[in-house]
Amino acid sequence: MAGYRKLGRPTDQRKAMLRNLVTSFLKHGKIETTETRAKETRSIAEKMITLAKRGDLHARRQVLSFVTEETVVQRLFEEIAPKYAERNGGYTRIYKVGPRRGDGAEVVILELV
């Protein structure tokens, strides 16, 4: 079994989509997407928050290599990471919204706790 979900896309498209989802999630604090995308986004976002909690230059550069906007990285290190300083993981929550009207895909809201 693979260690990640393929999401029905070639590798480059999948990575680009996940980078955009993680960036939007950290920028807005919550996103609405399908369940499998949310689960994949959650795992990456939690790793980014854990990196940001370290707070050193190397961690910032590692996050910058994945997150597409510098303002989001700044928000992650100055606002989000200090908020979770005492928490060991579990920074996100997934709420089920229901099926999407167009194709019946299960839609969820992914948000920061």
Swiss-Prot record:
Biological processes per GO annotation: translation
PROSITE patterns to which the protein is assigned, alphabetical: RIBOSOMAL_L17 (PS01167)
Keywords: Ribonucleoprotein, Ribosomal protein
InterPro entries given in the database record: Ribosomal_bL17, Ribosomal_bL17_CS, Ribosomal_bL17_sf
GO cellular component assignments: cytosolic large ribosomal subunit
UniProt-recorded Gene Ontology molecular function terms: structural constituent of ribosome
Any Pfam family hit: Ribosomal_L17
Keyword Ribosomal protein found: yes
Family: Belongs to the bacterial ribosomal protein bL17 family.
Subunit-structure text: Part of the 50S ribosomal subunit. Contacts protein L32.
Protein name, per record: Large ribosomal subunit protein bL17
